[in-house]
C-alpha cells in the first residue's frame, strides 16, 4: 500500500511552470468552449473550467518582424525607373553561382546596360557612368552572343614609331654636287665628309645624317644597294 498522502501528486510534465488546472466544474468542456489569446500565453475558457498555459516564447512576433523586413528590402520595385527603361533578369546557368539571377537595366535612347540600381540612379543624376565601376555597355548587338565562350582575347598591334622630323637647315632642292669621305683620326667618328678640300662642319654633317634617316625611313627603296 502506498504511503503517499492524498492530494500530494508529482508535477505534471505537460504543464509549464506556474500553470494550473482548475478543479471547478465537471472536468469537461461544453460546446461553448473557445480559444482566446491572453498576454504571455494561450488560454482556453469554457463553462465552469479554464485552462491557462504559459508559453511566452514570442515566436509569432519574430516571424511577423522577419516578414516585414523582407518586404521592406524588396520595396520599391522597378517602378522607380523613368518611362521607357527596360529591365531584364538573367539566370546564370554555369559555374559556382549557377542559379543566381542578375538584373540588368537598359536605357531606352542609347541602349546602354547598367548592372545595378545604384549605377542607374547615378547616371540619371549626373548623366554619366559612375567612376570606379565598369563602363556601361552599348547593347545594340545581341547580348547573348558571347555567352558560353571563353575569355575574350585582345589583339594588340605593335606601335610603329613615327619617322624623325626633317632637318630644318638642310636644303633638299640644292644638295651638294660632290662629297668625298676620308678616314677620321683617333677619337673622331669613322668618316669625315669633305666638299672639295674643305671639311664639312659637324653641324652640317649632323643635318645630312638626319636627312638621310628621314628619307630612307619614308622610302626604303631609294637606298642604294
From Swiss-Prot:
Organs and tissues of expression: Expressed in rosette leaves, buds, flowers, stems, mature seeds and roots.
UniProt key word Nucleus: yes
GO BP term, example: regulatory ncRNA-mediated gene silencing
Main localisation: nucleus
Disulfide pattern: none
Region feature Disordered, mapped onto this chain: 25-92
PANTHER family in the record: METHYL-CPG BINDING PROTEIN, MBD, METHYL-CPG-BINDING DOMAIN-CONTAINING PROTEIN 6
Designated name of the protein: Methyl-CpG-binding domain-containing protein 6
Organism for this UniProt entry: Arabidopsis thaliana
Amino acid at each position: 500500500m502506498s504511503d503517499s498522502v492524498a492530494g500530494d501528486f508529482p508535477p505534471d510534465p505537460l504543464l509549464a511552470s506556474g500553470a494550473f488546472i482548475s478543479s471547478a466544474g465537471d472536468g469537461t468542456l461544453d460546446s461553448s468552449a473557445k480559444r482566446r489569446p491572453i498576454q504571455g500565453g494561450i488560454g482556453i475558457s469554457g463553462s465552469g473550467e479554464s485552462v491557462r498555459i504559459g508559453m511566452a516564447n514570442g515566436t509569432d512576433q519574430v516571424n511577423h518582424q522577419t516578414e516585414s523586413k523582407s518586404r521592406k528590402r524588396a520595396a520599391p520595385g522597378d517602378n522607380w525607373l523613368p518611362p521607357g527603361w527596360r529591365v531584364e533578369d538573367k539566370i546564370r546557368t554555369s559555374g559556382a553561382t549557377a542559379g543566381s539571377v542578375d538584373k540588368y537595366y537598359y536605357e531606352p535612347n542609347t541602349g546602354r546596360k547598367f548592372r545595378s540600381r545604384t549605377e542607374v540612379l547615378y547616371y540619371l543624376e549626373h548623366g554619366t557612368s559612375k567612376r570606379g565601376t565598369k563602363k556601361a555597355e552599348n547593347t545594340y548587338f545581341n547580348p547573348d552572343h558571347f555567352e558560353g565562350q571563353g575569355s575574350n582575347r585582345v589583339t594588340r598591334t605593335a606601335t610603329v614609331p613615327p619617322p624623325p622630323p626633317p632637318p630644318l637647315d638642310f636644303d633638299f632642292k640644292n644638295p651638294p654636287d660632290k662629297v668625298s669621305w676620308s678616314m677620321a683620326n683617333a677619337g673622331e667618328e669613322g668618316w669625315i665628309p669633305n666638299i672639295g678640300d674643305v671639311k664639312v662642319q659637324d653641324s652640317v654633317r649632323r643635318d645630312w645624317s638626319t636627312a638621310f634617316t628621314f628619307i630612307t625611313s619614308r622610302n626604303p627603296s631609294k637606298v642604294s644597294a
